[in-house]
Structures are given as structure tokens and as C-alpha cells.
Amino acid sequence: MHWNEKEQTFCDATIDEYEESVHVCHKGYISIFPFLTGMLGPDSPRLKAVLDLIHDPQELWSDYGIRSLSKKDKFYDTDENYWRSPIWININYLVLKNLYVSAFPSFDLFARGI
């Protein structure tokens, strides 16, 4: 996992068809794991970007919970979509738990608004 400055999100590392390590950005649960695990504190300069990703209805936000993959991603809701759009209750619990934690003190109004 790494921070991608251009995408303003945490991205993944994978092995490509040539068995070389490459960085890939598919905004989804992987992008919010540092927030979900408490590794991204309330004073982190990256917290606002993560909260924006969670709260954007064109990305992860939905009427029913946080999507596992961004609605904008080319793989969203395609083929075998086990990780490509469904909403997972355990991840949504962690989002709520960490929104509560991050609401104090620095992102009080923004985090509470989500």
C-alpha cells in the first residue's frame, strides 16, 4: 500500500503479467484501510482526502453503505463482482467507528456531517 499524490488516495501494489511489482490505483476499500485500522490519525494531512473519497456518491458513498469499489472505476459492477461493488457490513462498521474517533478534535464538523 502506498500514498499516490496524484490520485490523492492510498493505492495497492500487485504483481503484473511479467512478475514485476507495480502500483495500481483502484479506489475502494484498499484506499481507506489506513483510516479503518486507526493508522490514519485525526491530525493526518491525508485524512480529508480519505473522508472526501468515502463521502463522494460518485466514489464510495451510497444510500446503503460504503461501496467496496468506486463507482467511477472501470471494474465497478463487472464480471465476477465479489469485490467490485458490494457493500460489506464489517467494513461499514469500521467506517462508522473511525468517523466517531476522527470527529474529535480536528475534523469535528466534517466527520460528523458524514
Provide a role label for each language-model segment.
Residues 1-87:
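Extended glycan-interaction surfaces of carbohydrate-active proteins
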Residues 109-114:
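Beta-strand segments within the central parallel beta-sheet cores of soluble alpha/beta enzyme folds
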Residues 33-43, 93-108:
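Well-ordered alpha-helical scaffold segments within catalytic/enzyme domains
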